[in-house]
Amino acid sequence: MKRLCFALTIPLALLACGGREMPDDQGLHQDIVNSSSGAEVTFDATLLSDPVESGGHERFQVKDPAGDILEIDHNTTLAASVPAHAGDALVIHGQLYIDPGPRVGVHCTHAETSSGCPYSGWIEFQNNYYE
């Protein structure tokens, strides 16, 4: 019995350690309040507008649970398009940017890093990852 428990513990530990980041909605809100442009964020979102393709990017607006509205800039030359529509739920992992205005958004939502994207990101929709 001890061997069975030990044998099951290792795969479960690896799965837990190798998983994706969990949403931190309050952390995102604090990063916005603190103007932490460049922060790595993972958060729940509701799609406010259907994605629009423009210049190799899919752009759309989302609302987080705190009520913040963000622009998502998803590079479709590095990642698959997200087949979502207004009202759909997403989980987004990427880099926060805050431009003058202020315009708040997230980019670097792709697995393949590029200049300006220090880490990989993704968008989860209906248990599928677009990265």
Give residue spans per PLM region.
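Positively charged n-region of N-terminal signal peptides that target proteins for export
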Residues: 1-4
